[in-house]
Amino acid sequence: AAAELSLVQLESLREVCEQ
């Protein structure tokens, strides 16, 4: 579960960087 949460957080950060 922790690993999945980390992946989700990384995706969110990527979206923020793209904006």
Curated annotation (Swiss-Prot):
Binding site residues for Ca(2+) 1: 11
Binding site for Ca(2+) 3: 18
GO biological process, alphabetically ordered: bone mineralization; cellular response to insulin stimulus; glucose homeostasis; negative regulation of bone development; type B pancreatic cell proliferation
GO cellular component: extracellular matrix; extracellular region
Superkingdom, natural source: Eukaryota
4-carboxyglutamate, modified sites: 11, 15, 18
Localization, UniProt: Secreted
Amino-acid positions noted as binding Ca(2+) 2 in the UniProt annotation, renumbered to this chain: 15, 18
Molecular-function annotations in GO: hormone activity; metal ion binding; structural constituent of bone
Transmembrane segments: none
Domain Gla: 1-19
Maturation and modification: Gamma-carboxyglutamate residues are formed by vitamin K dependent carboxylation by GGCX. These residues are essential for the binding of calcium.
Primary localisation category: secreted
Assigned keywords, A-Z: Biomineralization, Calcium, Gamma-carboxyglutamic acid, Hormone, Metal-binding, Secreted
Family: Belongs to the osteocalcin/matrix Gla protein family.
Known function: The carboxylated form is one of the main organic components of the bone matrix, which constitutes 1-2% of the total bone protein. The carboxylated form binds strongly to apatite and calcium.
Name of the protein this chain belongs to: Osteocalcin
UniProt gene name: bglap
